[in-house]
Amino acid sequence: MKLNKYIDHTLLKQDATKAEIKQLCDEAIEFDFATVCVNSYWTSYCKELLKGTNVGITNVVGFPLGACTTATKAFEVSEAIKDGATEIDMVLNIGALKDKNYELVLEDMKAVKKAAGSHVVKCIMENCLLTKEEIMKACEIAVEAGLEFVKTSTGFSKSGATFEDVKLMKSVVKDNALVKAAGGVRTFEDAQKMIEAGADRLGTSGGVAIIKGEENNASY
């Protein structure tokens, strides 16, 4: 199985340095990963480093809590795309979902998608904080909002992707959206199992180790 184009090569830790971001991009070019996934401060630098390659740039929005206003998320998206982002990973308004304020959750996603235009938008759901029913509802709303992906986790909460959650998400979105598994994908075997469960993309800081058949224990 050729995994490279499944991988969003990720570096989101708050103490990431310019040298580490350069290494991330160099590795993404070498292994021809789908995208690098970074915070917005680094987007324009990644654009410069990745110019002329097939590697995209995923920018996180409302990260990692998802609890900022809709207007803030939309502004973040506009700035990210202006700086060179090709894909957006937005964090769901988790509190609003738990309060069953589904209208706000939907409008939040729609506003991000509107700001993103033709760019791919993934909704990060933070499944470890959600019930099975909440995961299913969030997937349904993401499809209604026209988002291209649903995503399991930020990698910054209690736990990351599970095979069971990926299967559940895929069963809800079917062919209407894709699924991204993130957090805890550390080995080639993990990656294979996630893909078999229904994942179309993998968010991991260990893309190089995974491709080489090693285990990654680096922070996200």
Curated annotation (Swiss-Prot):
GO MF annotation, one: deoxyribose-phosphate aldolase activity
UniProt enzyme class: lyase
Family matches, as Gene3D superfamilies: Aldolase class I
GO cellular component: cytoplasm
SUPFAM superfamilies referenced in this protein's UniProt entry, alphabetically: Aldolase
Family: Belongs to the DeoC/FbaB aldolase family. DeoC type 1 subfamily.
Physiological role: Catalyzes a reversible aldol reaction between acetaldehyde and D-glyceraldehyde 3-phosphate to generate 2-deoxy-D-ribose 5-phosphate.
Protein's UniProt name: Deoxyribose-phosphate aldolase 1
Species: Mesoplasma florum (strain ATCC 33453 / NBRC 100688 / NCTC 11704 / L1) (Acholeplasma florum)
Gene: deoC1
